[in-house]
């Protein structure tokens, strides 16, 4: 074995050990262990013996062809499974150490914020400001605190000059930022993106990823 190859192997080994050390220092947030799910209307599982652990601070991309189970994993994480989409599960699935399959949609929304592929499917308010404030209104946050929080989050995603606009007046990139603000407003633990760049041009996509 050449000296260069030995160095490469040592570097790889050290990087793996460092990653394992960092994992031990952080807490797992999402844990799938031998997890399987089969929709009621299907004859075989969409997810079969999935093992996946995501730790605090990690950014994970799930990639695969159509029908490979990407959306099913997302539905498990945001609570649509088993609350909306029914089926049979086996194995364990935890969020922040708790059995995630026992959470209702409201409980799950306290931990997970979802940004959909098509922002138009997610808008609720008549204006950008109302849409960002929607979750705070449901939590009965005092009005002044709500106004300050909406302004702060809108500045973070660079839509603070559009708070009085209708969401449907915005460009694709601006719409995506508004939906992101709507989930950031509650200081949630997990951000879940369902193909957030699918409808964006390269420049808008890069800006969204930076946020």
Sequence positions of predicted segments:
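Conserved ABC ATPase signature
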Residues: 166-170, 174
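Catalytic Walker B motif of ABC-type/P-loop ATPase nucleotide-binding domains
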Residues: 191-195
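ABC ATPase NBD Q-loop/coupling interface
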Residues: 92-107
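A short, flexible loop at the N-terminus of ABC-type nucleotide-binding domains that lies
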Residues: 23-32, 37-49, 81-86, 102-104
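Conserved ABC ATPase "signature" region
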Residues: 144-162
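Hydrophobic anchor residue at the start of the ABC signature
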Residues: 180
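Conserved catalytic motifs of ABC-family nucleotide-binding domains
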Residues: 187
């Amino acid at each position: 074995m050449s000296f260069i190859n030995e160095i490469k192997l040592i570097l790889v080994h050290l990087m793996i050990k460092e990653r394992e050390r960092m994992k031990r220092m952080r807490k797992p947030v999402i844990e799938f262990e031998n997890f399987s799910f089969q929709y009621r209307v299907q004859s075989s599982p969409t997810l079969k013996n999935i093992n996946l652990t995501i730790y605090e601070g990690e950014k994970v991309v799930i990639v695969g062809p159509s029908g490979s189970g990407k959306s099913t994993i997302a539905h498990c994480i945001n609570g649509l499974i088993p609350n909306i989409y029914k089926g049979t599960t086996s194995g364990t699935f935890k969020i922040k150490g708790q059995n995630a399959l026992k959470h209702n949609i409201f409980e799950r929304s306290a931990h997970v914020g979802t940004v959909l592929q098509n922002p138009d499917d997610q808008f609720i308010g008549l204006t950008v400001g109302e849409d960002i404030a929607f979750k705070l209104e449901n939590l009965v946050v005092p009005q002044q605190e709500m106004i300050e929080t909406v302004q702060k989050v809108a500045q973070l995603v660079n839509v603070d000059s559009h708070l009085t606009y209708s969401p449907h007046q915005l460009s694709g990139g601006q719409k995506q930022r508004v939906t992101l603000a709507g989930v950031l407003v509650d200081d949630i633990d997990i951000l879940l993106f369902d193909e957030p760049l699918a409808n964006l041009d390269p420049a808008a996509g890069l800006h969204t990823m930076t946020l």
